[in-house]
């Protein structure tokens, strides 16, 4: 099969995987509505998802707070896919309209992240650098869930993890904490022995097809 043929088949498979039943107005978490393959969801997040940790100082309490977010944006025409993904994740999180004809799916409640989001990616691991972001994100989530971030030691652990997550620490955080006190931990390494599932390939529309041919 030619490269163009492979691309066409994967695009057809991708559409077949998520263009099933659609929840257009309400979220129905009935098991029979789960139409997405879990590897497809992982592949989709590898291509378009993000794991974020925000550390912000509260003006009222005068202390630092930590919030987490699992999210991704799509064009509004793909809103039905976001709704299916929300159903797949047991209805947690929310879908909001953004600017430039974008819609965004977010999960920010720590209990939902711990009990719904993290278990999925433990069972169906990410294959790109998103895997490293996920491991760091998970470690921060566990600190927050156990309220360890409320202590100075726990907050320093969060900052050390965040320093290696995505773009690292903001200028404000670097100026607010002594440089010697925050040491970025080494980013977890992505396994080079992972077996690529065809459903992952169909889901990872943002990941280039060259992984098939190198």
Residue spans for each PLM region:
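Sequence-level preference for short, compositionally simple segments enriched
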Residues: 1-214
């Amino acid at each position: 099969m030619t490269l163009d043929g492979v691309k066409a088949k994967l695009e057809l498979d991708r559409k077949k995987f998520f263009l099933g039943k659609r929840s257009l107005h309400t979220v129905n978490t009935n098991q029979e509505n789960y139409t997405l393959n879990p590897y497809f969801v992982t592949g989709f997040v590898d291509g378009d998802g993000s794991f974020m940790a925000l550390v912000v100082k509260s003006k009222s309490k005068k202390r630092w707070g930590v919030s987490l977010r699992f999210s991704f944006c799509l064009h509004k025409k793909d809103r039905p896919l976001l709704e299916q993904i929300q159903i797949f994740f047991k209805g947690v999180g929310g879908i909001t309209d953004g600017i430039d004809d974008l819609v965004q799916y977010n999960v920010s409640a720590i209990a939902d992240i711990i009990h719904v989001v993290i278990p999925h990616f433990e069972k169906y691991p990410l294959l790109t650098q998103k895997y490293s972001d996920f491991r760091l994100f998970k470690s921060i989530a566990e600190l927050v869930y156990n309220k360890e971030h409320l202590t100075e030691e726990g907050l320093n652990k969060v900052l050390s993890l965040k320093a290696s997550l995505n773009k690292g620490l903001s200028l404000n955080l670097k100026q607010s904490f002594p440089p010697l006190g925050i040491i970025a931990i080494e980013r977890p390494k992505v396994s080079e022995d992972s077996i690529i599932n065809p459903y992952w390939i169909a889901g990872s529309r943002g990941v280039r097809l060259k992984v098939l041919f190198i």
